[in-house]
Amino acid sequence: MPHSPQKLYKKLLGGAGEKRVAAYLKKQGCKILKRNYRTPFGEADLIVQDKDEIAFVEVKTRTSDKFGEPREAVTPEKQRRYKKIAECFWKERGEEPNARFDVAEVYSDGTIEYFKNAF
């Protein structure tokens, strides 16, 4: 079944935002471990190694703040799911290093706001 034009636009917009954040994090010295890491609990947009920490990154891309700040869309339920996603990742790797949960906001003008330890 084909995607509606609106869903396709959102998917393309989100993918572009994730690429932009991945490039930003690489410039900061991070190593991208996984993109769009899927589990039964949901998907982590990016998982990155930042020195001795693993960051699970939720990327929010918006063309406006009409519906609030992008980070406001990371609800308590989404935060719980991200923690379950992290558990799946640790089981897969057989280790549990220092972890944090970050949120990246990407705006249509290319601006990125990055929040370490967002939740």
Task: Indicate where each model-derived feature is located.
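Positively charged, solvent-exposed patches that mediate nucleic-acid binding
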Residues: 37, 49-50, 71, 87, ...
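Solvent-exposed, charged helical/coil patches
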Residues: 1-28, 72
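Residues at secondary-structure transition points
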Residues: 8, 12, 16, 41, ...
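A short acidic/basic microdomain associated with nuclease active sites
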Residues: 26-40
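Short, charged, amphipathic alpha-helix that recurs within catalytic cores of restriction-modification
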Residues: 73-93
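Short acidic/glycine-enriched loop/turn segments that link adjacent beta-strands
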Residues: 40-42, 109
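Domain-level recognition of nuclease-like catalytic cores that cleave nucleotide substrates
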Residues: 92-119
